[in-house]
Design a protein with these regions (language model features):
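Short, conserved beta-strand element in jelly-roll/cupin
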Residues: 45-59
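Structured secondary-structure scaffolds
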Residues: 112-160, 166-167, 223, 279, ...
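Single conserved hydrophobic/aromatic residue that forms the stacking wall/gate
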Residues: 514, 519-523
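Short acidic-glycine-tyrosine-enriched beta hairpin
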Residues: 65-78
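Short beta-strand His + acidic residue motifs that chelate non-heme Fe in jelly-roll/DSBH
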Residues: 42, 60-61, 77, 83-89
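N-terminal, positively charged nucleic-acid-binding surface of large information/translation enzymes
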Residues: 114-320
Length: 523
């Protein structure tokens, strides 16, 4: 006989679980404890493992799906099956675990296509950041989120996963207002025009979009956004608060994002309002060094504005917990670590503006929901719209635990996607633990300097994409994609790859093979 009793004094940490060994059973065995209000790390291993829950309550998250864990629950994990133990109760969650290596079962699991192993039968929603309709797409845009997401979706489908590519146009950006002023149009006209141009350029790039959401043209979007924002406000964490703000010294106009430039208070690089593209850290405009009104040498006036505010510094543990569950590149984790070293990190959720969706709440009649928090809802709305067209019952108001979300975006969007949005989802839907993978790209340079829509320093998609050239462009951008560091698009290098590799090597090889194959008459 072999009797083992649980002893809390001999526990040690493994994968975020307090563990102790049970010896002499012929298989690996032990006791496990997850304390109230905590979760284990997301982990997987080559053993088959069985849990028997003996006390407490919680959930088991297995490859993104959530299952209840109460006394009497027995669950077996196959080799390499990712799992998380989350204690949702007020007492310790205790379980006995038994594990062993079964080479045949492990081999069968590994033999499954990678997408099936990771995503199973779950719906997989792959988002490329909705572009701002203040201009068409250039090769810098196309090489980043859009080509990346397109290739990823194609690969998942080849491996049997149910995956879709979703994007749209980010109509309510302040950059649309500035573009409209410059072009002599209304913001609505500007967004409509460039949204159509963007969709056409994606088509020319042979990028198939399963759901393209045009936020200003969607009749159900505004009310859904207001519902989402109301949920966030009703959580009690987002409240109206007076804070420092910048104003035009002559007109008194409130300045944010596109309206103001200066020096990043964190890294010292040139930055626009609210975000630094270099270090990825947010600013509140008023903390920019040497700020100036865009298009003017005038220094803005410092004042105060009452806006909806999120004390993001209060959610460091929530963000770290979220990052433990999915694919999060090291650079995004480093960004989160830097930001949460700040004692205060207040983020405005609304701004005075005439362009955008006003919140439903009283007291901010001159304000709109800031477009970046808005985008957190926009992704869920895209899933709902896709589902409606497919006859599926997906709802932005009730996100489902088995949804797998995969984001593709440039590093300048990292703060919003990987830090702000998980917090907003937690406030709006506290019972939902979103399973999100993040794929970030660095900037593609053009002849050594940044592509820029606003400065018109770019090679526009429509200027290079034709039915004859699209494969060569896709190949070169994939070959030269800035996945971990900045890369450069050089016209001379593109011509060299086209003429020497694609035509001089590949095409000649195909032509030679065709000429030397025996004809039917010779066989």
């Amino acid at each position: 006989m072999n009797i083992s009793n649980y002893d809390a004094d001999v526990l040690h940490d493994i994968y975020g679980i307090d563990m102790s060994d049970i010896d002499g059973l012929g298989v690996g065995a032990g006791w496990g404890r997850v304390k109230a209000g905590t979760s284990s790390d997301a982990h997987q291993h080559d053993e088959t493992e069985t849990f028997v829950i003996v006390a407490g309550s919680g959930v088991l998250i297995v490859d993104g799906k959530q299952y209840p864990a109460v006394p009497g629950t027995v669950i077996q994990f196959e080799a390499f099956e990712s799992h998380v133990v989350r204690n949702t109760g007020s007492e310790d969650l205790l379980f006995a675990t038994f594990y062993w290596r079964d080479e045949h079962r492990a081999a069968a699991r590994v033999a499954q296509p990678a997408a099936r192993r990771r995503f199973g039968d779950r719906p997989t929603f792959v988002f490329s950041t909705p572009p701002t309709p203040n201009g068409d797409l250039h090769l810098g845009h196309l090489s980043g989120p859009y080509l990346g997401a397109d290739v990823f979706v194609r690969f998942q489908r080849l491996n049997g996963a149910e995956a879709w590519h979703l994007t749209g146009s980010d109509d309510y950006q302040s950059y649309v207002v500035e573009c409209a002023r410059r072009d002599g149009r209304t913001p609505k006209q500007t967004a409509e025009h460039y949204s159509r141009e963007i969709a056409e350029t994606l088509r020319l790039m042979d990028i198939s979009i399963d759901q393209y959401t045009v936020t200003d043209a969607d009749d159900t979007y505004s009310e859904g956004l207001r519902d989402f924002f109301t949920r966030v406000v009703d959580s009690g964490s987002v409240q109206l608060k007076d804070g420092p703000a910048l104003f035009d010294p002559e007109s008194g106009r409130y300045l944010y994002e596109v309206d103001v430039t200066g020096t990043c208070p964190t890294c010292g690089s040139g930055a626009g309002g609210n975000i630094c593209e270099e270090c990825g850290e947010p600013n509140n405009c008023a903390d920019l060094l040497a700020p100036s009104v865009r298009g003017s040498s005038a220094a803005p006036r410092l004042g105060t504005s009452r806006r909806y505010n999120l004390p993001l510094h209060s959610f460091a543990a929530d963000v770290r917990e979220h990052h433990r569950a999915g694919k999060v590149p090291v650079r995004l984790r480093e960004l989160a670590n830097r930001l949460f070293q700040r004692s205060e990190l207040d983020i405005s959720m609304s701004h005075p503006s005439e362009w955008g969706v006003p919140p439903r709440q009283d007291g901010v009649s001159d304000q709109v929901i800031w477009v970046w928090p808005e985008m957190a809802y926009g992704f869920l709305h895209g899933i709902q719209s896709l589902g409606r067209d497919m006859g599926r019952t997906w709802s932005a108001a009730a996100p489902e635990q088995d949804w797998k979300i995969v984001h593709f975006f440039g590093y300048d969007n990292s703060f919003y996607h990987s830090i702000l949005y998980p917090v907003l989802y937690g406030l709006a839907y506290p019972e939902w633990a979103p399973d999100i993978d993040y794929n970030v790209n660095e900037f593609l340079l053009l002849e050594g300097s940044k592509f820029s829509t606003s400065r018109r320093h770019a090679i526009w998609g429509k200027d290079i994409l034709t039915p004859d050239s699209v494969d060569a462009v896709r190949y070169y951008l994939a070959l030269n994609r800035s996945e971990t560091e900045r890369t450069n698009f050089s016209a001379a290098d593109f011509d060299s790859v086209l003429n020497d590799t694609l035509i001089g090597s590949w095409q000649e090889s195909v032509s030679y093979t065709h000429l030397t194959l025996p004809t039917n008459r010779e066989v």
